[in-house]
């Protein structure tokens, strides 16, 4: 029995040891490199990387242990950071008359400033050092090097103002006879001097501008006015209503009620240099007789781009390009190849919603240090209480790092230090979750399809599938984005779509019959669909009819002149032939002439297209390039899907 008990105990230890080390053996040991992987007690799926010394932390981005107290982790509110050795940093200031090496104001300087009527403070103008501050109601006399009161030099104030602010005792040269016990009881007007005209040596009230004392208040000079004086301002600005501060000169004024009548109801009216201007707000444009913020051009969303109205013009922009790390952005296509995640936690400080971006670099450094350099950008979505951050990674994050922020590796009381500089509350971090972009960044694109497409996350793709009542004609793919181009008709259900997808094909409903077909510019292979590399017989015949040679390049068939041959060039058309009309009508479209060629357009667009100028052509993207890129990406995904099916069957 004793032997059996020992055997059972041994097996239990082996099983327990295997369970505890599984996360480390499967992933953690390689992740931690020169640090030691340890399973978090009570959480067998979580691990931490322990460095050989307590004064070190593991930097997952650099794959190495680093010292905790360095200039990388220390913030200097004043002075500069200096590392006395690899494991010790401190904030220091250069030796000076006013500061110590530890950036403290010297006692001698503080005493001297106090004797001159001021308070010694650290400079906040970008320079390192101390300054003798005379306060809001004083100024430094650079001749005597003493603080002088400015309350009686302020023409923008009254004696009642000084009384209510309890400032009467600061300067006896004005407001004689006023009593702070009753600021509403003013003495006779001719018995005291008003602020701006203090009492002089002869007992008379003197304009401070004439005695040059106004220089303590006015930075750019002064001039005498009916209100004692007012400050002058530099070119491009004018004195404000208080007579002291300066404000920029505006050449634009508001419109009168009569002038507003010349504008449309939705336009803003302003007068610039005497001319009445009627304009839409900067984020709207004029469509018909109304200013609207919505885009009316569909080409943006057809290429997976967002459309926005800026400075009264609508334009396409790619929401992914501004988020990418380097110059490897294809300027001709809007691709989504990155992976988006979200995480929330409680920091030791809070910001208002206008300053969330201030925290992004700090959070990015902490995230990369914790889980690795795959994350290249952080966007703070909310920071008013808890921080909600969007993490953008070059590739999918390992499932083993998604709970990494929840393991408090470096506790400090009720807080956890996420090196190098992020302090968060214990147990406040959520698990890192992949973001479903259909519910966030792709909402605008989904809305732009006007109910024809619905955004669905399918495996690795965000797919704008045809909605009920629409059927797929073909598909476009840009990285992780896919869109089914739809037309009114019977749509396939999820089972039919899944059945076709398993074959690497798309569902097509034509002539009352449903079937699976290879996407355009792919062809059936031994398994699934493969990317085309040659012209098909129909394309070859069309080129031969033109005495040209069919060449398949850039994912499309083109008719080219053979080498050393002089070829016939098809003349420009000025009207659609019966064959052209029939071809377009078969797909529910209408034939129009663009740049001498017959093209098929949706009937709703045909009227506009028929009158389109050459300038409109320049604004459209090259359809060859976009479709070629789409087929290339689609072909690659389908080939991978087919390969996966084969592997699974084997």
UniProtKB/Swiss-Prot annotation:
InterPro entries, alphabetized: EGF-like_dom
UniProt-listed Gene3D superfamilies: Laminin (2.10.25.10)
Domain EGF-like: 20-66, 67-104, 205-247, 251-292, 291-335, 482-530, 531-568
Annotated disulfide bonds: 24-37, 32-49, 51-65, 71-81, 76-91, 93-103, 209-222, 218-231, 233-246, 255-269, 263-278, 280-291, 295-307, 300-316, 318-334, 486-500, 492-516, 518-529, 535-550, 543-559, 561-567
The UniProt record lists the keyword Membrane: yes
Residues of the propeptide: 628-650
Sorted UniProt keywords: Cell membrane, Disulfide bond, EGF-like domain, Glycoprotein, GPI-anchor, Lipoprotein, Membrane, Repeat, Signal
Signal peptide: 1-19
Subcellular location, record wording: Cell membrane
Disordered, as annotated region: 603-628
Chief site of localization: membrane
Glycosylation sites: 141, 182, 348, 382
A GO term from the CC aspect: plasma membrane
Membrane topology field: Lipid-anchor; GPI-anchor
Organism superkingdom: Eukaryota
GPI-anchor amidated serine: lipidated positions: 627
The protein, known as: Glycoprotein antigen BM86
Organism of this sequence: Rhipicephalus microplus (Cattle tick)
């Amino acid at each position: 029995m004793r032997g059996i008990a020992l055997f059972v105990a041994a097996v239990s230890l082996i099983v327990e040891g295997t369970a505890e080390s599984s996360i480390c053996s499967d992933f953690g040991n390689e992740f931690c490199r020169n640090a030691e992987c340890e399973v978090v007690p009570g959480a067998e799926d979580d691990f931490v990387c322990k460095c050989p010394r307590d004064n070190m932390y593991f930097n997952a981005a650099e794959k190495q242990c680093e010292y905790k107290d360095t200039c990388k982790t220390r913030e200097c509110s004043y002075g500069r950071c200096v590392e006395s050795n690899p494991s010790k940093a401190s904030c220091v200031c250069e030796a000076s008359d006013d500061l110590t090496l530890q950036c403290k104001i010297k006692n001698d300087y503080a005493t001297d400033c106090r004797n001159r009527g001021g308070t010694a403070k650290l400079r906040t103008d970008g320079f390192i050092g101390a300054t003798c501050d005379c306060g809001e109601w004083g100024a430094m006399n650079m001749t005597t090097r003493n603080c002088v009161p400015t309350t009686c030099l302020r023409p923008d104030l009254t004696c009642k103002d000084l009384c209510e602010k309890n400032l009467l005792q600061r300067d006896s040269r004005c407001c004689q006879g006023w009593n702070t016990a009753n600021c509403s009881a003013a003495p006779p007007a001719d018995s005291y001097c008003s602020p701006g005209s203090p009492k002089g040596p002869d007992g008379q009230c003197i304009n401070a501008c004439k005695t040059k004392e106004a220089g303590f208040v006015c930075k750019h000079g002064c001039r005498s006015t009916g209100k004692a004086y007012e400050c002058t301002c530099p070119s491009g600005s004018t004195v404000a209503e208080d007579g002291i501060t300066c404000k920029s000169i505006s050449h634009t004024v508001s419109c009168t009620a009569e002038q507003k009548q010349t504008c449309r109801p939705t336009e803003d009216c302003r007068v610039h240099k005497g001319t009445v201007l009627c304009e839409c707000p900067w984020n709207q444009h004029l469509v018909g007789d109304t200013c609207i913020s919505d885009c009316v051009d569909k080409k943006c969303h057809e290429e997976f781009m967002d459309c926005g109205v800026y400075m009264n013009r609508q334009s396409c922009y790619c929401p992914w390009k501004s988020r990418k790390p380097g110059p490897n952005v294809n300027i001709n296509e809007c691709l989504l190849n990155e992976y988006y995640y979200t995480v929330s936690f409680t920091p030791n400080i809070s910001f208002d919603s206008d300053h969330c971006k201030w925290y992004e670099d700090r959070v990015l450094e902490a995230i990369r240090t914790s889980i690795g350099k795959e994350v290249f950008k952080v966007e703070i979505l909310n920071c008013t209480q808890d921080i909600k951050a969007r993490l953008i990674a070059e590739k999918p994050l390992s499932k083993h790092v998604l709970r990494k922020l929840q393991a408090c590796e470096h506790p400090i009381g009720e807080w956890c230090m996420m090196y190098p500089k992020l302090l968060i509350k214990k147990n406040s971090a959520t698990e890192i979750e992949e973001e479903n972009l259909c519910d966030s960044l792709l909402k605008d694109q989904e809305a732009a399809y006007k109910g024809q497409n619905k955004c669905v996350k399918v495996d690795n793709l965000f797919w704008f599938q045809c909605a009920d009542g629409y059927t797929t004609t073909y598909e476009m793919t840009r990285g992780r984005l896919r869109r089914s181009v739809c037309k009114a008709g019977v749509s396939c259900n999820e089972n039919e779509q899944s059945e076709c997808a398993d074959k690497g094909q798309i569902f097509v409903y034509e002539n009352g019959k449903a079937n699976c077909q290879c996407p355009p510019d792919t062809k059936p292979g031994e398994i699934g669909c493969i990317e085309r590399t040659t012209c098909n017989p129909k394309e070859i015949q069309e080129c031969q009819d033109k005495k040209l040679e069919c060449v398949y390049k850039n994912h499309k068939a083109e008719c080219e002149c053979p080498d050393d041959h002089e070829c016939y060039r098809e003349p420009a058309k000025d009207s659609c032939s019966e064959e052209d009309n029939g071809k377009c009508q078969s797909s529910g479209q209408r034939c129009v002439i663009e740049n001498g060629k017959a093209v098929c357009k949706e009937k709703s667009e045909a009227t506009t297209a028929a009158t389109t100028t050459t300038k409109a052509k320049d604004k459209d993207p090259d359809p060859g390039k976009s479709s070629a890129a789409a087929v290339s990406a689609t072909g690659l995904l389908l080939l991978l899907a087919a390969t996966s099916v084969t592997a699974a069957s084997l």
